[in-house]
């Protein structure tokens, strides 16, 4: 009664197989991309940092360890992408996750947009089907560290929302959508309009009572899977391994038949129970293959058909004899129902485990194994190490040998040509696997072990152009052409980057140029204005202002102008100017000199002073006797003119006396004497001696003429007047030169201790273009009160006794009389004493004056 299925499938059934489903992993939940030959990893890649990419049109996804408990504290994610314009439908087949009120402990989410949750489920109730609105979805599974359950198992299918035609193993919904045939009448609305469940209600209506007929004692009632009506079957069909009832009533609660064996040969074959008939529900078989050789074992499934209803049936293949999840090579399910399937081990041992649920059954599988390099007795070697093929595979248009030996030299084709199929169409070797179909059925591009030059060999034995590799498009169908691609920047990006860098560089140069220009303008503006000195610079450059003339007099550093001593009224101005000239040369007074003439000698400075007509002062030494000298009294002009003339006279005393008489006569109203000739003195000594002698004579005679008083004249010594005058002049000149030499020597050693006048001279800046030096010294009004006999003092010491009124003349013979003030550098210490002279310095001064001025007392 049971219907037997043919061992060979028709071409129509083969072409109508379910669209290359992706196999789910039993125990580990690992997934792999589906193609004609699918390799599934033993360890899931979904439970990691990145989601597992799935591109197959359909498949099964299970939680890690299903149907056993899933691990604690895991996070798994899957990303399913369909073709553009398609939608994805998910149908849950088993679901058992720890439940909570808001599903915040263990949960499963489905998202159309990343990180935007649209579906969350937990608990033990199977969720309703999920239909996406986009061509991609994210599936995420999370578990905490508490309770673990069995997990979930779901199937997905992708297709367009409306198809004109569906495959023979698919069901067309009322809205035009196609779903797998197995989803019909499963109490799940995968169509979206419940059209896949409406027809089931009509078919499930039990027949009327009249349709039932009583069965004999050795029979049982069964809803035939073939006629779909209740019938009576003999008891012998129960638990025979063959399903006769639609509801599997004849094979439920039966003992599982013993299956599986230990295979120890280099080659062999095995199959599922009752093959090619349906295997019994609940079958659990294991085959251990141990060839005793270290070489690889090649396992081929020539026929494979499993049931996918309920929990699903599966076949697991392990590398080795132990059931080690880490050595899992492949998991085959109902979605791998195509042949041939090939699995290669890494050693000479393989473990094959087959498990079926008790819900439904299918035809099963047929498999062969052999050591790498050996062929089965009924196979023909391909040559070398290229494998084997059978006689049925000869000239069938499909390459079973990598070198094409099973398809070469066929009767319908010429030499070195290969048939497209058994219809007589052939093609040359150069057209094989070049990604260009020359056969109507495309057999020249199938099962390509090698590709023509310029093509890339995909993992699913397809060939694509090399230029299509790493172009961000899946051309192989399994994504192998986009794996391990280097990060190559497109030419457009490089061009844009170069142009952008050039523009940025140009802008940078312009910015730098503008910055430099602004900086130069800023610095130019800063140089155009005077900036204030910093505090440190101001402290370094700050100099103390020199004291005023009044402060110097008040402090006693310099004497008043009235204190300069003179021998006669006519001689006062000349002697004062001469003393100041010598003092300025020695550094004791402030005289402003031009820069070019400061290195001149002392005598050029003395005789090069010009008279200033605007200052009211006297020139130092004038060679012009007729020059008018301003004064406060007109009676003093003849005396001063006479003094000027006598400074330049080098004649005898008689000549001087005669000249004095002329001057006196002219002064008293007589006839004016002729002007004397301008004879310049030969030396400064003669000028100095002449000035002293003339001043003495003028003072004596002027006293008789003006005052009318009798003055006792001093008798000259026995020596001749000329010799006495020369001796006195030489003595005074010697003393002056000795004073100058001493002062010059002391000035170099006490340069750091200069007088205030010298400091004043250094601190005052004058005009560099002044050629003349003026010495503004007022003329004393008390010249008539001076003692005419006080001309015996040294030349450089004449102003020491000048005071506010009449002062006692200095007498060298009376050392008890101490002058109150003394100008000029001290002979002992080299310092100018403008106030009281110390006793130590006074003793040395008195001693020198006593010894040096004895010859000068003749005046």
From Swiss-Prot:
Extracellular side: 33-492
InterPro entries in UniProt: CUB_dom (IPR000859), LDL_receptor-like_sf (IPR036055), LDLR (IPR050685), LDLR_class-A_CS (IPR023415), LDrepeatLR_classA_rpt (IPR002172), Sperma_CUB_dom_sf (IPR035914)
Signal peptide span: 1-32
Family matches, as Pfam families: CUB, Ldl_recept_a
Paired cysteines (S-S): 47-76, 103-122, 166-178, 173-191, 185-200, 215-232, 222-245, 239-254, 259-285, 375-388, 382-401, 395-410, 413-426, 420-439, 433-448, 451-463, 458-476, 470-485
Membrane topology (UniProt): Single-pass type I membrane protein
Domain of life: Eukaryota
Role summary: Probable receptor, which may be involved in the internalization of lipophilic molecules and/or signal transduction. May act as a tumor suppressor.
Protein family: Belongs to the LDLR family.
The protein, known as: Low-density lipoprotein receptor-related protein 12
